[in-house]
Amino acid sequence: ERWDSLRLLTPNWLSRLPSYGYEGDDPHGFRTMPETIAFLERYAEVISAPVLTGTTVTSVRRVLDGYEVLTDRGTWQCQAVVIATGACNIPNVPAVAEALPRGIDTETPKDYRNPDQLEEGGELVVGASASGAQIAEEIHRSGRPVTLAVGEHIRVPRVYRGRDIKWCMDAAGVLDDPYDEVDNIVRVRNVPSLQLVGSDDRRNLDLNRLTDIGVRLVGRLV
């Protein structure tokens, strides 16, 4: 459920799981989605994890000796629960999309795969965080005129003083900040993802670059 060219925003070396990490020869590269899936599958094999796919969790509650997890395949007892569903599993489609003329097709990042699936003509990309910026760049390079609706976004360099920005964040402890020590948790949870792209040339991807290659920037859609 991701576009074909998507790569992780984090370098390979930053893929760290308990007693398991990156084992390849390109630690500063960026994994594709098939490579990411293979990495997780290999980890499951190494630790003999009883992976259950297609399972719906209906509730989680604390009990005396840990947690009780109710699912559509039974009840589990465990000492710890990791919620890693991500923030983008359900597309956030603005209500104004329902008022668009029938002749205008709409796609969400969940359904978008590559520019070949799009109709001929110009494209409006709504949102300019990591996903929106990457998709806008890709569609523009396919030869279509692209307009990008921009809100509040965070611009960072891919490389700072010779180091990947994720290395800087990791070294500074930013990635380890506990949620209960954040000044404004509501704002933090709503801060858009960094404008980054994982690429072999480690290039920057921000509004300036998009403007330079010909992407038209406008304000918020709603």
Where are these regions (language model features)?
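Glycine-rich active-site loop/strand segments that organize a redox cofactor
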Residues: 2-38, 149-207, 211-212, 218-222
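Glycine-rich dinucleotide-binding loop and its adjacent helix/turn
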Residues: 22, 26, 32-35, 85-142, ...
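Generic domain-boundary/flexible-linker signal
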Residues: 62, 92-93, 157
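Residue-level detector of flexible, active-site-proximal loop/helix-junction positions
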Residues: 21, 58, 64, 111-114, ...
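Sequence-level motif detector for i,i+2 pairs with an aromatic at +2
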Residues: 12, 64, 102-104, 212
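Feature captures the FAD/FMN-dependent oxidoreductase FAD-binding
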Residues: 28-89, 209, 214-216, 222
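A generic local structural motif
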Residues: 68-71, 93-95, 108-113, 183, ...
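Short secondary-structure boundary/capping segments
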Residues: 6-7, 59, 73, 96-99, ...
